[in-house]
Amino acid sequence: MSTTVPPEIEEHTRTLRALLHRWGYAYYVLDAPEVSDAIYDQHYRELVDLESRYPELVSPDSPTRRVGERPASAFVSVTHRVPMFSLENAFSQAELEKWGERLLRAIGPGLEFICELKIDGSATALSYEDGVLVRGATRGDGVEGEEITQNLRTIRAIPLKLLGGEVPAVLEVRGEAFIPRDEFERINQERQAAGEKLFANPRNACAGTLRQLDSRVVASRRLGFFAYTAHYGRAESQWEALAELESHGFRVNPHRSLCRDLAEVRTFCEHWENHRHELPYDTDGVVVKVNAFDHQREVGFTSKFPRWAIAFKYPAEEKSTVVEAIAVQVGRTGALTPVAELQPVAVAGTTVSRATLHNQDRIESLDVRVGDTVIIRKAGEIIPEVVRVIGELRPPEAVPYVFPQTCPECGTAVVRAPGEAAVRCPNPRCPALIRGKLGHWCAALEIDGIGDKLIARLVSLGLVHTVADLYELSAEQLAGLERLGARSAAKIVEQLDRSHRQPWSRVLYGLGLRHIGASVSVELARAFASADALARADLAAIASLYGFGEELARSVVEWFAQAENRALLERLKAHGLQLAGGGRAAQSSALAGLTFVITGTLPTLSREECTALIESHGGKVTSSVSSRTSYVVAGEKAGSKLARAQDLKVAVLDEEQLRALIETREMP
């Protein structure tokens, strides 16, 4: 952690994560929301903002490391062939131009951008084999989603069989399902007549429709679909990929533009910011991408976002409301987070009743007081936040807010390190910290039945202090708790037993290592097939993984260096948790001990297929060329990585030579 990050901000960030994990688990997994969408979105935006301003705060357990909801138990969970990354957001033209200028410096002349409308719906993955739709799924957490093939077949804009004479053997299509505004109004009118709860907005209506168990309900609603990218196709640019999708019978949004500089990008964004309400569907921004795929490969990914794309969000809608109270919540890292409780107000389609105030500094800088009239804004038309106080409307009885000097959970005197913003509870046994860790574990391992209320009771009774303690609970102990009963207790014990079958990657995610989210945990588990192997790995070995870096690697190394964490692993192992498995099964060891970098466009293999080929024979693929690189596999339009390999005298192979190397284990 950088010393430049104020402690109060660090602590507040941890608090936000704990809240969002609990709320997200209740909403997406249990289908039993504890708070409104507006409250969740409000806190999520605050976390996005903090992690954007302080990249050091990005944590493996952060909800922003997810790219969507966890699959519900009513649907079959499927693994995406290609992970569905979320996009970094730009909330101003300045942020957008900063992103573009960074890419211009990295790539140089010839860089082109493509602008596409960001449809406000549900991201969807479609899999075609030999031109036939074989599977459709929700985005889920980006690695796994829910199979909803039957529901997606009812959407007329999705071809069941690809058009065109020449179709690829395998095609992965990504797109956005959505509900037009007029259809949204019709659906809500029907629900109102039937006495059912109304959908808050078209986006929520679309998500709820796609998760219907009865596909006849989906068919009765007029959903639309725009395809926006494809994998394993023949295109060499995003512009060509969209044309290829159209040739196969997909509906592609016609409002797109190929831009040769940032000025053209700005013009496109400004136009649709002013004219978006003329469209028959909702759009909450513009997606800007680097057009050429070789340029996309050159700049690569962060652990969560592609560096070559960004979502420009339209300026937010603002409303005024009154602060009725200011509550302070304690996160699992001990940070105290103040939250403004508001008179409910509708902002951009959802009802906002709570707004985060981030930290003590934020309250003091805004001078927010109970009774104040404040401006609420939904940044990107999704996430609400308090922008400012309307001082002229302040009631005479309003007094400055005094931040608590003791933890509201345990009474310990709070601390604030010099130069940091976070006010923290320093007590490692604070019930709030323990509850947060337990909640994250149960969400990560999909343990049903152990919600916030039960966790609070277990902690208050002293029955549970760590996640390992959960596995020492008996049905008799649980049944003795008020309002639980023998049947519920037995189900909880059964759920804990079932969590033993969760893979090593999910256990790793549940441990809550900093910067190691769900998708990163999958990659780590593939590269290091056991906790012991990961514990033995050094900084360089972890940092060399594709898409990783020193910051992620250091988080892993430091976590495994702590004795209490190693002791926790031993206890979990003794309880039967999966601390091994999940590595890619090797067809041979022909490439064992060799490290590869892939650059350019290969004749027959996509980058993903080439990576899988190398790893299936024991090799390792990294994203950057160094003196430790064994071979660079280069295709057409190979960029700076090829030049780097030549400078370092690293051997360069083409696709044919790579295959020969596998067969003979000798340089051809």
Swiss-Prot record:
The family database entries (InterPro entries) matched by this protein are listed as: BRCT_dom, BRCT_dom_sf, DisA/LigA_HHH, DNA_ligase, DNA_ligase_AS, DNA_ligase_CS, DNAligase_adenylation, DNAligase_N
| Alphabetical keyword list | DNA damage, DNA repair, DNA replication, Ligase, Magnesium, Manganese, Metal-binding, NAD, Zinc
* Annotated GO CC locations: cytosol
Question: Which PROSITE patterns does the record match to this protein?
Answer: BRCT, DNA_LIGASE_N1, DNA_LIGASE_N2
Enzyme class per UniProt? ligase
Q: Which cofactor does it need?
A: Mg(2+); Mn(2+)
The membrane spanning regions, by residue number, are: none
**Binding-site residues, Zn(2+):** 407, 410, 425, 430
**GO molecular function annotations of the record:** DNA binding; DNA ligase (NAD+) activity; metal ion binding
Catalysed conversion reaction: NAD(+) + (deoxyribonucleotide)n-3'-hydroxyl + 5'-phospho-(deoxyribonucleotide)m = (deoxyribonucleotide)n+m + AMP + beta-nicotinamide D-nucleotide
Pfam families named among the record's database cross-references: BRCT (PF00533), DNA_ligase_aden (PF01653), DNA_ligase_OB (PF03120), DNA_ligase_ZBD (PF03119), HHH_2 (PF12826), HHH_5 (PF14520), Nlig-Ia (PF22745)
Q: Which domain of life is it from?
A: Bacteria
Query: Belongs to which family?
Result: Belongs to the NAD-dependent DNA ligase family. LigA subfamily.
Task: Describe the task this protein carries out.
Answer: DNA ligase that catalyzes the formation of phosphodiester linkages between 5'-phosphoryl and 3'-hydroxyl groups in double-stranded DNA using NAD as a coenzyme and as the energy source for the reaction. It is essential for DNA replication and repair of damaged DNA.
Its recorded name reads DNA ligase
Q: Which organism is it from?
A: Gloeobacter violaceus (strain ATCC 29082 / PCC 7421)
Q: Tell me the organism's taxonomic lineage.
A: Bacteria, Bacillati, Cyanobacteriota, Cyanophyceae, Gloeobacterales
